[in-house]
């Protein structure tokens, strides 16, 4: 099947009431210029839609190219998530021949869409950048991620492409995973992965035939370690962070001994929780997976606002004293 151009989808979405089959109650949310709010990627474009009756916001994903096994995979994922009750995930629904598009790309005019809840918030990397000078928020988001990571390790399914760009931080600080294209569910056992995930967050030995409930394990360990380090020493984010990369990248995974980021991290092992997460990272790296009991290594103490501020204030006071005593500054 040949899929429509982005411009053709936009035109169809403008008149969604006429062009949707079952979703005719949805209308596009428009930006300041009167255009539908949308986000595009390599394989799909996502529109922000609103239910005219309830006011609820939804995300409608329209596809730009063919992917083998996509329909079957989405149906299996939707079936699995139907019985999962968690704030970390949002339900999805795959609808065949849902949107009519007058396209020049082929003879087909009806195309599938994926319906999801719209998740309002910032991607994890943007949240870190916006709060890089707020030690409490950095500590709290590290704690929240480790809670989510611990929960994921206990599940039989896996997200498949765990990275900051696919983790949304709501206004209340809660985390939500989005983009389930690479998800593994037990019903897929024996299949090959449809995608391998971001190179900066996947294990260097991950291949398409490695497709099981453990494919998130290394990503969880890497992100958890990076967040903890940033919460303790934010300047390392400025030094090593780039794009949606927090600290570590594919180059580090290939040669740990010569990783500048890991070398900086190892100088901070006087912190008990950081040492704990560093051990988890090395364990995930050596085995390309973590056992179900490893989740306890992600259990961090919930940060208290006054405690974090007091620690930072003390550190600043010591620094100022040292500068005064040595004539620095």
Task: Name each model-derived stretch.
Residues 91-133:
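Conserved structural core of kinase catalytic domains
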Residues 229-319:
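Helical subdomain adjoining the active site within ATP-dependent kinase catalytic cores
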Residues 191-205:
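Conserved activation segment of eukaryotic-like protein kinases, specifically the C-terminal portion
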Residues 1-37:
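Juxta-kinase regulatory segment immediately upstream of eukaryotic protein kinase catalytic domains
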Residues 36, 45-90:
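ATP-binding glycine-rich loop module of kinase domains
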Residues 153-164, 169:
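Catalytic-loop of the protein kinase fold
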Residues 179-183:
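Activation of the activation-loop gatekeeper triad in protein kinase-fold domains
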